[in-house]
Amino acid sequence: MKFLFDLFPVILFFVAFKLFGIYPATAVAIGATVVQIAWVHFRHGKAEPMQWVSLAIIAVFGGATILLHNETFIKWKPTVLYWLFAVTLIGSVIGWRKNLIRAMMEKQVTLPEPMWGRLNVAWAGFFAVMGVLNLYVAYQFSTDTWVNFKLFGSMGLMLVFIVAQSIWLSRHIQETPSE
């Protein structure tokens, strides 16, 4: 359910684009992200830092798209977010010696120490490639194709990556002793 909730602004953007075009869809995405964070804040007392970052990026790039009537800005938004994720994953290890993937997953999965580093790099690489791929689709195809890719292509590639990662991890997961 959380996965669908996280996709709420993207799904509304997609529907609004199909019905009204890129500029109204961008306004809908900004509004949906604000509503999403307000709801999370209301339900849980605070929103996650990445939700705030996502709001800031959609507000800046979406706002520029609407104000300047130039769809290029909204097309850059996923790339900026993907690259920010990649830099954050690598930067947290280099700057603070903290593996964020491990911090998020270690309660669910027990892995040998070197595997956490590889997993972190794999996710950073995935996000870096997704940023490049988004720009490729944005500049080489129509806006309609880009919007379809933004929802279905990105989600499909993420699913393939997660399945491949799960298969790869299954060979390295360590059993935890039962009490």
Curated annotation (Swiss-Prot):
Its main location: membrane. It comes from the Bacteria. The keyword Protein biosynthesis does not apply. The chain crosses the membrane at residues 3-23, 49-69, 76-96, 121-141, 149-169. Keywords: Cell inner membrane, Cell membrane, Membrane, Transmembrane, Transmembrane helix. It is a multi-pass membrane protein. Signal peptide: none annotated. Plays a role in cell envelope biogenesis, maintenance of cell envelope integrity and membrane homeostasis. This is Inner membrane-spanning protein YciB. It comes from Cupriavidus metallidurans (strain ATCC 43123 / DSM 2839 / NBRC 102507 / CH34) (Ralstonia metallidurans). The gene is yciB.
